Structures are given as structure tokens and as C-alpha cells.
């Protein structure tokens, strides 16, 4: 059955979910398949987190953090995340930066400072946006909203593999604890808590390959009458 959601001339597909649910990889592959732009919103928060560490801004100082975010020079070029003109793509994937990103994302002022930057990614021919509030806050008119989930054990295993491949040390027990703490923090924050949009399609990736997850998203997009 085709969706009754109004067609937007610049369509957006949102893929939300918790840390290490596979949303970033799935979003990138869907975007590549469709020839759409890609927004990795988590990278924006990680860049803000890295800046807060560098400039020694405390994670509970909401006003100072919002001011810092407003003045950041952030760019994405050829898949690389740059802070003040320097490629920090690998640095922002460190666990310490990820934990700081989750901590500063609880502040409404920080999230508000990043809203316009995220919405500016919407350009023709379309956008695939991944994050935690893409379908609920940033792009509520998205033509397709997907909410990825996976067991915490599956997510910890994926995260461990990612970190090891990037040359970071990782401990499974610590990763499990960190993921549970992040889930609680992301789901219980007052500003844009992690939750599926009312019209989001749930996709549990625990037992799925990346290819199967991507094909399911594309199948849902085709059901809307869109070429995929």
C-alpha cells in the first residue's frame, strides 16, 4: 500500500536509532544507491563534543556549550569531518568523544544551535539523514521514517569491531555498560528524547546483514512509488 504522506520536491528519508544500531552504515548505503545527499547528525554532535574537550567547556554548562557550537567552523568534504579546517574524522569516533556527545546532547540549547545546520543538508535530489531525532524533530515531513533497533549485545559487538578496525582499544564489558548508559540518557532527556516517530517503520537489525537492512529500507521507499 502506498503512503498518503504528501510528496516533497526534495524528499528526505530519516533513519533513527540508538548507538551502534547500524543506522550510519545503512543510511550511507541507501544514500549512495539513490544518489542522495547524506547527513550524519551524530558527527555534528561528536564535533561539538570534541570542541568542548579541546576548549575545556564543561559538559553541564549549557550556555557555554551553545555559544561554543554557534561559533564552530564545521565542514564535511568527501566523507571527511573537519573542525576548524582540520580532518578529525577518526578522532571523533573515540569512545570518550562519543560519551561526551551523548552528555552534551541533553541540553535543549545545544540541540537548538544545531537544528539549522542539520536542515541545511536538505538539497536536491534528496537526503538520507541518520540520527536520533531526525524523524521526530529535524525532518518531521520526511517521506520515509525508519527506526533501527538491535539488541545491546549485538550493538556492543558491532561497536567493538568498529573501534578495533580504527585502531582504538575496546573492552566488551565497558562497551555494554556505556551503551546502556547512553540509551538511558538519550531516551530520558527532556530535549528530543530518542524515540521512534509515530509513523516510523521499525527495523530490528540484530539478525540482519547490512545488505538486508538496506534492501528493506529501499523496498519501503519503492512502496511509496519512488524509483529505487
From Swiss-Prot:
Molecular function via GO: ATP binding; CMP kinase activity; dCMP kinase activity
Primary localisation category: cytoplasm
SUPFAM superfamilies assigned to the protein according to its UniProt record, in alphabetical order: P-loop containing nucleoside triphosphate hydrolases
GO BP term (any one): nucleobase-containing small molecule interconversion
Catalytic activity: CMP + ATP = CDP + ADP; dCMP + ATP = dCDP + ADP
Keyword Cytoplasm assigned: yes
Record keywords: ATP-binding, Cytoplasm, Kinase, Nucleotide-binding, Transferase
Keyword flag Kinase: yes
One cellular component term from this protein's GO annotations in UniProt: cytosol
Pfam families: Cytidylate_kin (PF02224)
Uppermost EC category: transferase
Compartment(s) of residence: Cytoplasm
Amino-acid positions noted as binding ATP in the UniProt annotation, renumbered to this chain: 17-25
Record-listed E.C. numbers: 2.7.4.25
Family, per entry: Belongs to the cytidylate kinase family. Type 1 subfamily.
Matches recorded under PANTHER family: CYTIDYLATE KINASE, CYTIDYLATE KINASE/PANTOATE-BETA-ALANINE LIGASE
UniProt protein name: Cytidylate kinase
Gene of this entry: cmk
